[in-house]
Amino acid sequence: MTTNDQILINQILSGDANAFTQLVNRYKDLVFTLALRMLKNREEAEEVSQDTFVKTYRSLNKFKGDSKFSTWIYKVAYNSCLDRIKKNKKYLNDVEINEFTEHQVKTVNNAFDALVEEERNQLIQDCLHLLPSDDSFLLTMYYFEEQSLDEIADIVGISANNVKVKLFRSRKKLASILKDRLEPEIIEYYERAN
């Protein structure tokens, strides 16, 4: 756990509301992104994000510091999403993910390179959106949030080896979707060139 997180947690436990605001601001984008990945609905993701921070506040005294605080709050968010999915008994698939892509596009000097990078990221985001929630969540945690296998295992409640196997399968599914998406574009490109 970072020293800054521990300082904020101690301040919150001492009754400092401003410290909780700082903690929320530090993790709100990450929690919302994970909720949006799993629920695939903006309004649901916003509600679950709020629920996550309410639950975090209420149970902050139970946080022991055995893992990173980010891992702990991801687990709270993950479980809140699972609760919401069970409550709705359906996966909601009607919202595109744009904010996450905007944050991930790197600044480049050449406008053409930026456009190519944006299109590539959008394609990956679109394909991630087509995956089941669990696969999308695992790939997001590992590649975009840079969580370790052990941290992901702690969040989802399975062993690190199982996470590794699930990541492998998720990557294969993503590769298959990408291949299906890219082949028609490549064929169309070469047909236009002739």
Predicted regions and their residues:
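Sigma70-family region 2
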Residues: L13-S14, K40, F53-K68, K87-N88
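Arg/Lys-rich amphipathic alpha helix in sigma70-family domain 2
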Residues: N61-K64, K75-V95, E117
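Internal acidic/polar
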Residues: T2, Y91-E117
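Short helix-capping/turn signature of helix-turn-helix
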Residues: R26-D29, R37-M38, T140-Q147
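C-terminal edge and immediately downstream basic/flexible tail or linker adjoining helix-turn-helix-like DNA-binding
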Residues: T2, Q11, N93, L123, ...
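Structural recognition of an alpha-helix C-terminal capping motif at a helix-to-coil junction
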Residues: T33, E47-V54, S67-N79
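Short, charged helix-capping/linker segments at alpha-helix termini
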Residues: L13-Q22, F32-D51, I155, A160, ...
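DNA-recognition helix of helix-turn-helix
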Residues: L82, I124, D135, F144, ...
